[in-house]
Amino acid sequence: IRTYILKNPNTRKLPDQMRRLGANGIKMHTQLVVVPDVNDGKVLEDSIRGLHTVEGVETVAVVPVGMTGHREQLAKLKAVDEQNARDTIKLVEGLNEEFGGNFCWCSDEYYVKANVKVPDGSYYGAFDQIENGVGLIADWIDNFEYSLQEAGDMNLGKRIDMVTGVSFAPMLKKYSKKLAQKLGLQVEVHAIINNFFGTSVTVAGLVTAGDMIEQLQ
């Protein structure tokens, strides 16, 4: 399956290469990119269980395949939908509990697609997979609440504009109301549609300056 997805026969060597790294004291934080009907479900479960047996593998991030609007002459892939996201969350959370926690997590994007509340910050341990989008929302909420409490009440009387991707916009709008009330601000949140990579790309980290300028003018 790995060879099919990556179109590279050398990927068959990956398990042995990882075991060699682990045997030499290298610690690995790994990522599984999941394609519906290709490597989800039982295949995903087997992949996580397999990684759990590899010496040196510390954590696993499970992230949905990302597809831009530029897929000419590429294989047709199925995007993650709400039901698939819910099934994947259930699978991964169950395995994480089985392994004692702090081994495998779904990225925040899964929770957004599933319309499921993201776990609290304590669920993510040391946030080892935050760069893969695991626990970003929980960490942001924790930092926001702490900073807002430290700031105290103010009446700044200013207007500020915030920009983000489509996925995070509802969350940012919710917390911007707290910010406005606490600091005496007028806050407007702008959800930027990603025309550069394609409208299916909704994460904030891939919003481009060009799209921001075009949509805010």
What is the predicted function of each stretch?
Residues 1, 101-111, 116-124:
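Active-site-facing alpha/beta catalytic cores
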